[in-house]
Swiss-Prot record:
Residues 1-19 have a biased composition (Acidic residues). This is Histone acetyltransferase type B subunit 2. Residues 1-22 are annotated as: Disordered. Regulatory subunit of the histone acetylase B (HAT-B) complex. The complex acetylates 'Lys-12' of histone H4 which is required for telomeric silencing. Belongs to the WD repeat RBAP46/RBAP48/MSI1 family.
Amino acid sequence: MEPYDDGFIEEQEEQEEERTEEKVINEEYKTWKKNAPFLYDMILSTALEWPTLTTQWLPDKQEVPDKPYSTHRLLLGTHTSSDAQNYLQIAHVQLPNPSAPNPDDYDEERGEIGGYGGSSKKAPMEIKFNIVQKIDHKGEVNKARYQPQNPNVIATMCTDGRVMIWDRSKHPSLPTGTVNPQMELLGHTKEGFGLSWSPHTAGHLVTGSEDKTVRLWDLTTYTKGNKALKPSRTYTHHSSIVNDVQYHPLHSSLIGTVSDDITLQILDIREAETTRAAASAEGQHRDAINAIAFNPAAETVLATGSADKSIGLWDLRNLKTKLHTLECHTDSVTSLSWHPFEESVLASASYDRKIMFWDLSRSGEEQTPDDAQDGPPELLFMHGGHTNRISDFSWNLNDPWVLCSAAEDNLLQVWKVADAIVGKDLEDVPTEELEA
């Protein structure tokens, strides 16, 4: 009798695990789909030709005269197979205008107008999505972000470490077959995903990469006739891959950086030191820190997302210990973004295929055992519409509670949580008053 082949058995076990996981994902998706009409006022799912690793709403919207919708713009990339051309893309999305409450939708039982998913008496309006501009890009687009002072100017992170600057108004709607950025920022030796424009100074940019460095760029030093630009400063304060960087939204000299070295570090660009940060937090997460987000309304509050599945909340004035920890994700937390209008609301995405909304004003609230089974008191909402890892998400600046989320399986979703879920009970508690 032949002995068992250990490799064969391992392979069989792995396949069985994959089948089980697939079954669980499908069951979860079926449940989500069944409940979706009660959870959302609007949801669009569209399959892109290629997956995108990046998505961001552009800050404008265009009203369409005599129509019940407006046109919003989305910034996307592509992640194609090795042979196919990649693109930086702009899409138009038609979103229904928020409607005034209709007395015909009055629900006597609940004493409310409308309900979960808005009015049940009106047919949902079809949401139209189409790509309106494709610009040839070298390799996949790891991340794309528009410049706040001029949204036509876009920075992209490339797979070879280059950062490219594009002025979309100088490119035709259809690709030309030639990669022709306005500038190339040369310095990183490996690819990266950390990218943040200064909201304070036009043309200032910070990037972080797998080469363990953080680099500052000043686009105003660009000279015509030479597309290549070198960094104005290079920081070597991290000992491993730099995953995310962000300019502080209220303090022009502060930049936050996070890394696989399990540290959160704060740079003060007024200081000449480039090998050490002005402030740092160590030992507070148990694994790599993937994401950082400064609260745009509470100047001392920031959040970090980690491969240890948790979200850390911090007070800039004391990084020795976290203010609070949020736990509910079942896999690595990969991106974070504060709500643009609700100071206490934070959104997080994870490899567990979920986007979660957290309302920090609920921190410390008592829960019944049944409530506790659904998650911690801060958990406001969980988006379960993706069956694959989420690569990026973005809040819409013109329509509160509208998000766009993109997953690794080509699926792009534009969605708005039902007002009945998030439209009330958001107490105006200053985020600084959070207790650990």
